[in-house]
Amino acid sequence: MIEADRLIQPQIQAQDESIDRAMRPKMLDEYTGQDHTRAQLKVFIQAAKNRNEALDHMLIYGPPGLGKTTLAMIVANEMGVNIKSTSGPVLEKAGDLAALLTNLESGDVLFIDEIHRLSPVVEEILYPAMEDYQLDIMIGEGPAARSIKLDLPPFTLVGATTRAGALTSPLRARFGIPLRLEFYNIKDLSTIVTRSAQVMELDIDAEGAFEIARRSRGTPRIANRLLRRVRDYAQVKHDGAVTKFVAEHALDLLDVDSEGFDYMDRKLLLAIIDKFIGGPVGLDNLAAAIGEERETIEDVLEPFLIQQGFIQRTPRGRIATARAYQHFELIKPE
């Protein structure tokens, strides 16, 4: 298994939560990046407010660490309603979901992270709640059992997932607003790093912020995590200010290279290049070669490498691109 404390993993770590909460934007105007998604949300939110209606159900999907939870909270803030948060694996029984639904007030947001991991029995309860704002509950057992319907106030379900394809078709079809989050560009990440530094009361210049941003794999959560480690280095080894020089040396010490790769990324790329002559190589063989699970490669390691053009996924398997060879100063065989 991949190490849980990998510095550049996009999944949330225990130390991220309290600090990320302080750095999160509260309203859409404070939210940086994802311009198309922001523009859509502004229209949908204003329209719902004009009609005095609950916002339509929303599915936010994309790689981890891009701000799905933050967007859900922003939606609640913009609508002026409460938000209740849970996750798919936590909702084990129908009663778990029923307890949440019956405590919602009109217009409230129910946020379910990892919604693709809902159990079938819980999902069945969710369908009438989403479509008709009704909750079907079974009373009694055996032949005497009967179903009663409870009316629910209009509410907005915001589901978040890193694996939209894992949702069942009936569940996916019930979301009126699907939003895909993309990896961030370096300019937007630099803005996020600068804003986070202000929250931390940390002196950072534009070049220092840029250096952290370009090694952050297009992911705000990673950018904020790297910023905290660079701050440590700046305070111990320098005068506390973050410049390009300080950021470069701090990140080199942390083994995060110019592309944002750590040893796991390099291990994956070099396995394709050295052990499989650049590929193509099947996922099972690649997983065995680097000692990782298929899911870890698909969900954690690959997305950024593919998006940045270091790996190609073909019907025959994974291939290392010319850019991967160039990164290691190797010559790609013809």
UniProtKB/Swiss-Prot annotation:
Annotated positions binding ATP: 24, 65, 68-70, 131-133, 174, 184, 221
Record-linked InterPro entries: AAA+_ATPase, AAA_lid_4, DNA_helicase_Holl-junc_RuvB, P-loop_NTPase, RuvB-like_N, RuvB_C, WH-like_DNA-bd_sf, WH_DNA-bd_sf
Keyword DNA damage applies: yes
Region of interest: Head domain (RuvB-H): 258-334
GO BP of this protein: DNA recombination; DNA repair
Entry's localization field: Cytoplasm
Residues annotated to bind Mg(2+): 69
GO molecular function: ATP binding; ATP hydrolysis activity; four-way junction DNA binding; four-way junction helicase activity
Annotated GO CC locations: cytoplasm; Holliday junction resolvase complex
Region entry Small ATPAse domain (RuvB-S), spans: 185-255
Primary residence: cytoplasm
Binding-site residues for DNA, renumbered to this chain: 294, 313, 318
Enzyme Commission number(s): 3.6.4.-
Highest taxon of source: Bacteria
Keyword tags: ATP-binding, Cytoplasm, DNA damage, DNA recombination, DNA repair, DNA-binding, Hydrolase, Nucleotide-binding
Gene3D superfamilies the record matches: 1.10.8.60, P-loop containing nucleotide triphosphate hydrolases, Winged helix-like DNA-binding domain superfamily/Winged helix DNA-binding domain
Reactions catalysed: ATP + H2O = ADP + phosphate + H(+)
Keyword ATP-binding set for record: yes
Protein's job: The RuvA-RuvB-RuvC complex processes Holliday junction (HJ) DNA during genetic recombination and DNA repair, while the RuvA-RuvB complex plays an important role in the rescue of blocked DNA replication forks via replication fork reversal (RFR). RuvA specifically binds to HJ cruciform DNA, conferring on it an open structure. The RuvB hexamer acts as an ATP-dependent pump, pulling dsDNA into and through the RuvAB complex. RuvB forms 2 homohexamers on either side of HJ DNA bound by 1 or 2 RuvA tetramers; 4 subunits per hexamer contact DNA at a time.
Family per record: Belongs to the RuvB family.
UniProt-listed HAMAP family: DNA_HJ_migration_RuvB
PANTHER family, per database record: HOLLIDAY JUNCTION BRANCH MIGRATION COMPLEX SUBUNIT RUVB (PTHR42848:SF1), PTHR42848
Domain notes: Has 3 domains, the large (RuvB-L) and small ATPase (RuvB-S) domains and the C-terminal head (RuvB-H) domain. The head domain binds DNA, while the ATPase domains jointly bind ATP, ADP or are empty depending on the state of the subunit in the translocation cycle. During a single DNA translocation step the structure of each domain remains the same, but their relative positions change.
Quaternary organization: Homohexamer. Forms an RuvA(8)-RuvB(12)-Holliday junction (HJ) complex. HJ DNA is sandwiched between 2 RuvA tetramers; dsDNA enters through RuvA and exits via RuvB. An RuvB hexamer assembles on each DNA strand where it exits the tetramer. Each RuvB hexamer is contacted by two RuvA subunits (via domain III) on 2 adjacent RuvB subunits; this complex drives branch migration. In the full resolvosome a probable DNA-RuvA(4)-RuvB(12)-RuvC(2) complex forms which resolves the HJ.
Name of the protein described by the UniProt record: Holliday junction branch migration complex subunit RuvB
UniProt gene name: ruvB
